[in-house]
């Protein structure tokens, strides 16, 4: 293991990934868009090129909705969302902090909110896929 990286995984361990240990963990945010508010995850921004899927890439399923630009990645076995590629900034991933092994998630009880519900919708009645 590289001490310059933080390691994480889904609940069942089928999907494992790493991110740079130098990321500012105090920059974690919640989002209040229709998907994020339902999953309740605390997310951390990370340059997309710095996210490494260490194992289980074949176990990831992808979910896109509305504009079909943002891609949300879930383990096909346990259903945990590990990360997503953003619609507003495609070069940035949102990493689910709850998946990072070495972090005490209790330290993130009070986290600033990003106003995802303010994002423009193409069609509020669009069929979800």
Regions found by a protein language model. Name each.
Residues 1-9, 14-129:
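A short Gly-Trp-Pro
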